[in-house]
Design a protein with these regions (language model features):
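Surface-exposed binding patches on compact interaction domains or structured appendages
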Residues: 27-30, 52-98
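Bacterial N-terminal signal peptides
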Residues: 8-18
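Short aromatic-acidic-glycine turn motif
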Residues: 65-78, 126-127, 181-189
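Asparagine-centered strand-capping/turn motif at beta-strand->loop junctions
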Residues: 47-53, 163-171
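Sec/Tat signal peptide C-region and signal peptidase I cleavage site
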Residues: 20-26
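Intrinsically disordered, low-complexity Pro/Gly/Ser/Thr-rich segments with frequent PxxP/GP/PP motifs
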Residues: 74-107, 186-211
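Terminal connector regions
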Residues: 104-150, 210-232
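Beta-sheet-dominated interaction scaffolds and their linkers
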Residues: 26-53, 88, 148-158
Length: 232
């Protein structure tokens, strides 16, 4: 099956912030946790989907292998080894439902593996009205499997109109900002929020780079990193 590129068109998409202890919410739907971590060699995980509304909500939950292109778009590929139970559930008002999942067998590779659990609200036939389009909600939860030693390792290079930041490490990072400093010590900070997956890269638009760019610093949820700049 062809990969799907995640879109928020006609959907209310709640981005799951890593490290948060609060549930991710979209309308009346919520999920907890907002990021799932599975230890190396393990397969099982779970997710609680809540309905804070005043009417029943039916949801479909699916698991996808997850990657990102260098423009920052999520690529979701159906993964038959990612099993979700139940895949479809109706949740009563002000109630919640536990969803269990089983990941594909661990291949033993040292690099972190990543998926996304997608929770989609399904149309409610009782709410259908002629000429009215229902707004359906979506929640997207990242799932990571890695050992405790997994960590990012960044390099950077100049790309047309921006800076290409690559992660050659074994673990992901949730980037929050990138600071560029020139030889005179003048710094420009770009507030950017994105996941940089293990083995992945992203081009960060910068416009014109500082003359004599001398240092790059990435601030992420995992810490702050001085990033070497590759010379042409």
């Amino acid at each position: 099956m062809r990969p799907l590129r995640a879109s928020v068109l006609a959907l209310a998409l709640a981005a799951a912030w890593g490290g948060s202890t609060l549930p991710a919410r979209a309308g009346s739907l919520s999920v907890m946790p907002v990021r799932v971590g599975v230890p190396e060699g393990r397969r099982f995980c779970s997710l609680t989907v809540g309905n804070d509304g005043d009417r029943p909500v039916t949801v479909q939950v699916r698991g996808f292998a997850w990657s990102r292109d260098e423009g920052g778009a999520d690529i979701l590929t159906p993964d038959e080894g990612f099993v979700v139970n139940p895949p479809i559930a109706t949740i009563a008002p002000h109630a919640s439902r536990l969803v269990r999942c089983s990941l594909p067998a661990d291949d033993g590779a040292p690099t972190e593996q990543q998926w996304r659990l997608i929770v989609d609200e399904l149309p409610d036939a009782t709410q259908a009205q002629p000429g009215v389009v229902q707004t359906l909600l979506r929640l997207s939860v990242p799932v990571f499997r890695a050992d405790d030693r997994a960590a990012p390792a960044f390099t950077a290079s100049v790309a047309g109109g921006g800076l290409r930041i690559a992660n050659a490490g074994t673990g992901h990072a949730r980037v929050l900002a990138v600071t560029l400093q020139d030889a005179a010590g003048k710094a420009v900070t770009l507030d950017r929020s994105f996941y940089l997956l293990a083995g992945g890269a992203q081009v960060v638009p910068t416009g014109s780079l500082p003359q004599g760019l001398s240092s790059i610093r990435v601030r992420a949820e995992e810490g702050e990193f001085d990033v070497p700049l590759a010379t042409p």
